[in-house]
Design a protein with these regions (language model features):
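Conserved acidic/glycine
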Residues: 1-124, 134
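Conserved thiamine diphosphate
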Residues: 120-227
Length: 227
């Protein structure tokens, strides 16, 4: 039933093929238009100036020698990091003001607006930890989230998964003193620290001053396979 000469293409087939060619050409043209913009975005995500920024922060810490709470030291470090980074995604479980995890450079992620870098998780420590695992698995994002050390128990299943999956997820646990604070014994972490230290492939740091806090952030950011 083939009544055509060798290498002759019937018009019906040729016309359909041309339609596909036009569709492909349109896709290629669209890609060429957005390529330059995408290239800049992707390069910014892959590139970070963490080492340079943290080196400057260490010099400042030596010069100033201020006595600061480590959560305040962490905020100062984060403020420097978020001024240049496009892939640090911060957040807190309704304790941003206490954890000092939100900086002046952050923009809040809202429904319908995901072009930002800070999440208000609410009183949802377990959900926060699970979401951070998802962010780390999805792309080149480096998620970090804050809560009180006592509430690390709510995060424990996801923290363990971070370690098992070798994901760079950073947990900022403040208010780690065993001293009885204004919130009473329900907020008094006793066994939490030893429990976290028993998890394989989980780095647990407890800095004493601003310099150690900067070093902790540097190590956490460099540890690509360890939460």
């Amino acid at each position: 039933n083939w009544n055509y000469k060798p290498f002759e293409i019937p018009n019906k087939i040729l016309n359909e093929w041309k339609k596909i060619g036009k569709k492909g050409q349109k896709l290629e043209n669209n890609w060429n238009k957005i390529y330059k913009r995408k290239k800049i975005i992707i390069n910014n995500l892959l590139k970070n100036n963490f080492t340079k920024i943290l080196k400057t922060e260490k010099k400042n810490a030596i010069k100033e020698l201020k006595s600061l709470a480590t959560r305040k030291s962490s905020e100062l470090t984060l403020n420097a990091l978020t001024s240049v980074s496009n892939n640090l995604i911060g957040g807190s479980a309704d304790l941003a003001g206490s954890n000092n995890t939100k900086t002046k450079h952050h923009k809040i992620i809202k429904p319908g607006d995901f072009n930002s870098d800070y999440i208000h998780y609410g009183v949802r420590e377990h959900a926060m930890s699970g979401i951070m695992n998802g962010l780390a698995l999805h792309s080149n994002f480096i998620p970090y989230g804050g809560t009180f050390l006592i509430f690390s128990d709510y995060c424990k299943p996801s923290i363990r998964l971070s370690a098992l999956m070798e994901q760079r997820v950073i947990y900022v646990m403040t208010h780690d003193s065993i001293g009885l604070g204004e919130d009473g014994p329900t907020h008094q972490p006793i066994e939490q620290l030893s429990g976290l230290r028993s998890i394989p492939n989980l780095n647990v740091f407890r800095p004493a001053d601003r310099m150690e806090t900067i070093e902790c952030w540097e190590h956490a950011l460099k540890s690509s396979k360890t939460p």
